[in-house]
C-alpha cells in the first residue's frame, strides 16, 4: 500500500527514525520510515511490525501495524495511540526528569528503571505500569 496519498495529520514525532502523521479516514496514524545507515536502509520498520504481532500473539495489547511505502520508501504504519488529552513522553525524557545523571554517560540499571517508574509523578497507575514493563521486557527478550 502506498501511504503517500494521505494528508498530514499535523502531528509530529521524535525518535531515532523519521516519522510523520497522516490521516486515514479521519483517524491519525504514524508513518515510520526505514532508517538510512552506511550499509543502506535498516530493517527497523520490519522489527516494529513483527514485534507488535508477537506481542499480540502473546496476549499483550500492542499497536496494529501495517507495512507499505511512503514517498518511495518502505514504512511501517500504526494507528496513533495518543489520545486527544494525552502527551507522549519518551522513556529517556522520563529518566532525564527523574535521575540526576546525564543520559549520554549513564546506562540505566533495572533498579534505576523501577525507581523511575515508582517515583514518577506523571504516571497514574504505577503498579500496572511496572507489571506491563516486565511483560514487555520478557516478550522483547524472547
Task: Show which residues each predicted segment covers.
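ATP-dependent phospho-/nucleotidyl transfer catalytic cores
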Residues: 80-141
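Conserved ATP-binding subdomain of kinase catalytic cores across diverse folds
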Residues: 1-103
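Short strand-loop-helix active-site module centered on a catalytic nucleophile
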Residues: 55, 141-142
Amino acid at each position: 500500500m502506498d501511504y503517500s496519498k494521505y494528508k498530514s495529520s499535523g502531528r509530529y514525532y521524535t525518535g531515532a527514525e523519521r516519522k510523520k502523521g497522516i490521516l486515514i479516514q479521519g483517524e491519525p496514524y504514524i508513518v515510520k520510515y526505514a532508517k538510512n545507515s552506511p550499509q543502506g536502509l535498516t530493517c527497523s520498520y520490519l522489527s516494529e511490525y513483527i514485534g507488535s504481532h508477537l506481542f499480540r500473539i502473546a496476549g499483550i495489547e500492542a499497536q496494529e501495524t501495517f507495512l507499505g511505502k511512503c514517498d518511495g520508501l518502505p514504512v511501517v504504519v500504526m494507528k496513533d495511540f495518543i489520545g486527544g488529552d494525552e502527551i507522549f513522553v519518551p522513556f529517556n525524557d522520563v529518566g532525564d526528569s527523574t535521575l540526576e545523571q546525564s543520559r549520554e554517560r549513564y546506562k540505566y540499571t533495572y533498579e534505576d528503571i523501577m525507581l523511575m517508574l515508582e517515583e514518577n509523578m506523571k504516571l497514574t497507575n504505577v503498579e500496572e505500569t511496572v507489571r506491563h514493563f516486565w511483560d514487555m521486557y520478557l516478550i522483547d527478550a524472547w
